Structure formats: structure tokens, C-alpha cells
Amino acid sequence: MGAVDTSERLSKLRQLMQQHKVDVYIVPSEDSHQSEYIAPCDARREFISGFSGSAGTAIISLSKAALSTDGRYFNQAAKQLDNNWQLLKGGVEGVPTWQEWTTEEAQGGKAVGVDPSLITASGARKLAETLKKNGSSLVGVRENLVDLVWGKERPARPSEKVRVHPEKYAGKTFQEKVAELRKELESKKKAGFVISMLDEIAWLFNLRGTDIPYNPVFFSYAVITPTTAEIYVEDDKLTPEVKAHLGQDVVVKPYESIFADAQALSTKSQSAGENAAKFLLSNKASWALSLSLGGEGQVEEARSPVADAKAIKNETELEGMRACHIRDGAALTEYFAWLENELINKKTVLDEVDGADKLEQIRSKHDLFAGLSFDTISSTGPNGAVIHYKPEKGSCAIIDPSAIYLCDSGCQYFDGTTDTTRTFHFGVPTEFEKRAFTLVLKGTIGIDMAVFPKGTSGFAIDVLARQHLWREGLDFLHGTGHGVGSYLNVHEGPIGIGTRVQYTEVPIAAGNVISDEPGYYEDGKFGIRIENIVMAREVKTAHNFGDKQWLGFEHVTMTPIGRNLIEPSLLSDAELKWVNDYHAEIWAKTEHFFREDNLTRSWLERETQPISK
């Protein structure tokens, strides 16, 4: 995870910038579908900067370079950026945003360039307006300059086959989903919807792919109108089964033809006059796609109705999430029992990658296994403080049994997606480690036990996860929760729990699946995080003020919480009962996996025993 010398790459990029008459060049993290996680061929920001985190923006002027990222990645970026780069710590008071840094560098009528397919239309407009006030301009550079620097070394675009996601896991046919989308478009008087987000297309058509590691999606676009459904994907990626699945209901078109077709739709709309219905475009769609559709005057940009529908799981999907978390919980239990035995009893020397590999091996034995949902974060001691740490063979640490061990991992199963973090100490934790862990646990329980009226946002309940840390002057620099897909992306919008303004926009609704993951981190020492997946459900309350609908959470993660890190005296009676009830539930739902595995069964029995003050 060390720094890469980027001097030559930056030199070549600056030569290209001068050729294209660009003074500042922006390199976003995202691909042309604004994906958070990307295929290797789209890792442009990582290539040019050396920083491999999933979030961040690189900005290069003719004399400087800066990388902006959020609190999850401050430590990682500090280690991976060489001395050509300035780290902009997002959200830290007094540190400029990447937009502010760009504006400052572009003073005096300079041109700022960006690949228009890698930035949202709304983001481009806001930046252009800011630059205009400064006498500068934003220029769309269609030929990606980083790709030119990368050259033949750039990985090829994936060409794996697309496959059908059966109704027995999806819970609805794609025809039903398209019909519901059309009703919404009709109610909004829209001519159609152009879809660019990969997980939305996969969900809508009940299809899955492997184009992006850990995310079962495939490169595609789609256009839905009142009478037609078109999907833009390379024909050689479609198996006979997929073609039969789509049948006569969907027209398949070449992936690259979306922009020409979008221009044709724009021309047709303009010829129909001012009163013609507009096309709907997601507010996360690219500037390039928006321009092809005629820009702001020809389209309405809004939150995607498909994203909203996808986030509210049906009963089949919810049951799948329950089932896959029981299997996954059993796999994690087997792993932690194995790891403790190897470290403590056998005195085996294991590094962090050894641990991650063993966990994947155990998971792969379970029914409906379809791969991991992200790189396993297997971290010992100080590496646990690197929130999105990625261990690599040869440079990772040996797991220290006398230090805290944090493991954040997830899996894709055909019936659901998992994401679980557990923190263990296989030796004797310090009093402060126990105190910090218990404060984090109280936050986890606070979210889990929350009851709130319909219409409440994730922003509003975030304090329940942080309040106990705040009382002692502690905090964590990441969100408390993110949406989770159903055999889809492990990070799914539009809902979440956290301090970001975006979490005020969409209220939590019954059927949402969200992570509950407060943490605490001490740089250079340790990291603590406890992550469960919870499902928002309607709950019955003793009273019903205002005739409101009330919601609460049902946890589905079935993995024990490290008992020797819990300080029972810090827990209320209700919290203590929650821990004991939770561990009893885990035992009841997973012990049958280990009736012929005495090692794991004994570990599970020990870790799920009641605790008391």
C-alpha cells in the first residue's frame, strides 16, 4: 500500500493538457455510469495518483496536483500519495474542497477540462457557474487524457456474459417492474426515462453480470418509454437464455449507440414543440449523456424512480436477506473460531491476507455462494485504523493476537448481499479498548432499537449511533449506514444514515436494507467497528400520535459480538438484554451448522453465553 512515483505520468498528462489548451484537469473516481466501484479499465484516478481508495477526485494543474477524499481514506491516501500530491481532507475545517482548489488554480481566465462522461450534469453545471464568476471556464474533453497516458497498459474492458436473475430470488418479473415504472412516468407526464446506473439496469431487467469486481452488474444503458423498452449492451455478452428472458419485450441495441440514439430523441422532442413531454434523466447521469439528450432544456433531472423502487425490497428479497445472513453468519463464526485456535492454541503465524483467503474459502462452501461483495478488510492493530484498509500479500502485517483484529467483509449470494464487521481481541484488551468498544456497541444497539415515525431520514437518527462517543469527546469519520442491494451492489442509494446532507433527502421506508456500523479509530493503534445489516419494518406502538405509521429495524446479521471487549457496567439494562437476546438468537439460528464441528460449536457456545454486570 506504499506510494507510486507519479512524476512521469503527471509530466505526460501535462503535455497533453497543453496540447488540448487545458490549464487544470479533473480526474474523478467514477466511470461513465457514475459507479462507486469500477472495473480496472476505469481506474483512472488511481492510475494517475497512486491512490486506490473508492472515493476521491484528482485535480492536476500545470504545476500542482491535489487529491481530495473523505475521512474513510485519510490514512490510506497519506500513505499512497507521493510528494507530487497535496492531500485535501474532505470535510475538515479550513481545508478547501476540490472545487475550491480547482477554482483557485484556474484564476485568470484559465480553462478547466474534464471528460464529460465522468462527471454528473448537475456537478458540471455547478462547477461551470463557479468558474464563470472567476473568469474561467469548464471544458468537456471527450478524449480522456489519462487513457492516453495509460496507453497499451490500460486493462481491457470486461466482456463476460450476462445471466438471468431468477424470479424466485427477484420476487417480481422484469415485466412487472417495467410496468410500474411506466405508470410512474405517466403520472409525471414524461416521454420516457434514460437509465445509466448499472445496478438499476440489472435490477430492472432481472439480469446480473461480472463486469465490475464484487458488483454483479454489466456495462449497459436503457431507455424506457410508454411503449418501448431498449437495453444497450454488446450482443456477444448475451446468452441464449438471456435473449429468451428478454423476448419480444425488450429491444437490444449496441452499447455505444446510446449517444446517437439520445441525440435522435432530443431532435424528435425539439421538433414536437415547447409542449412536448420531456425525458427523465437521473441526477446521477453523466454530463455527456445529458448533452446528447439536449441538455437542461430538453430533459428533467431528478432522483431515479428505479433507485427508489430498488431500495424498497419485496418480501422475497427480504426473506433472501434473512437466509443469506444466517449462512454468512455461520461462515464468519467458523472463521473466527479457526483464527483464534490457530493464533492462540497452535501459535500459527498468519498474515492479514491469510485470514482473508481462509474466510473466502469457508464462505465458498455455503449454498448460493456467488463471490465476495468487496475486498475483505482483514486488519490487525494499527491497520484497523485505516477505515478501508486493503491488505496485500508481501506488505501486509502479521496478525498480532495481542492486538485488536478488525474484519469487515461481505459476500454475494444469489438470494442476497452481506456486509458484516466484527472486532475481536484474542488476548487481553486494555480498559480503554473495552470502553471504546462498548461505546461503539451502544451506538449499534441505539440504531437497532430505534422506533421513529414514517418520513424520518437517516440524518435524523444518526445521532443515536454517535451520542455515547460524543459524550466522551470521541467520534468517527464515516457514515453510520448505507443501503445494501439484493444480490447487487453492497453500497446502494439513495438511503443511508449519516451526517451528510444527502441523507436528509430520502426518508427511511419499510423494506429498506441498511448497514448499522458505528466505529472508533486511533491512528497508529487500533480500529473498532461493529456492523450489522438491518431491515426497516413497520412496528406496532402503544400509542399512535398523529395517526402516523411507525418504523423500526430488524437485524439480520448473525455473527457474535466479541464478548471480552464488552464492559457490561457501561450498558443499560435494556442494552444488556439486547446483547444477550441477540446472542441467543445467533445460537438458535446457526448452531445446527456445527453439530459435527466441535471446535466451532464450542467457540460459538462460549461467545453467545449471557453476560452480566
UniProtKB/Swiss-Prot annotation:
This is Probable Xaa-Pro aminopeptidase P. Belongs to the peptidase M24B family. CDD domains: APP. It catalyses: Release of any N-terminal amino acid, including proline, that is linked to proline, even from a dipeptide or tripeptide. SUPFAM superfamilies: Creatinase/aminopeptidase (SSF55920), Creatinase/prolidase N-terminal domain (SSF53092). GO terms for cellular component: cytoplasm. PROSITE patterns: PROLINE_PEPTIDASE. Binds 2 manganese ions per subunit. Its EC number is 3.4.11.9. Its cofactor is Mn(2+). It is an enzyme of class 3 (hydrolase). Catalyzes the removal of a penultimate prolyl residue from the N-termini of peptides. GO terms for biological process: proteolysis. Mn(2+) 2 binds at D408, D419, E531. Gene3D superfamilies: Creatinase/methionine aminopeptidase superfamily, Creatinase/prolidase N-terminal domain. One of its GO terms (molecular function) is metalloaminopeptidase activity. Pfam families: Creatinase_N, Creatinase_N_2, Peptidase_M24, Peptidase_M24_C. Keywords: Aminopeptidase, Hydrolase, Manganese, Metal-binding, Metalloprotease, Protease. Mn(2+) 1 binds at D419, E517, E531.
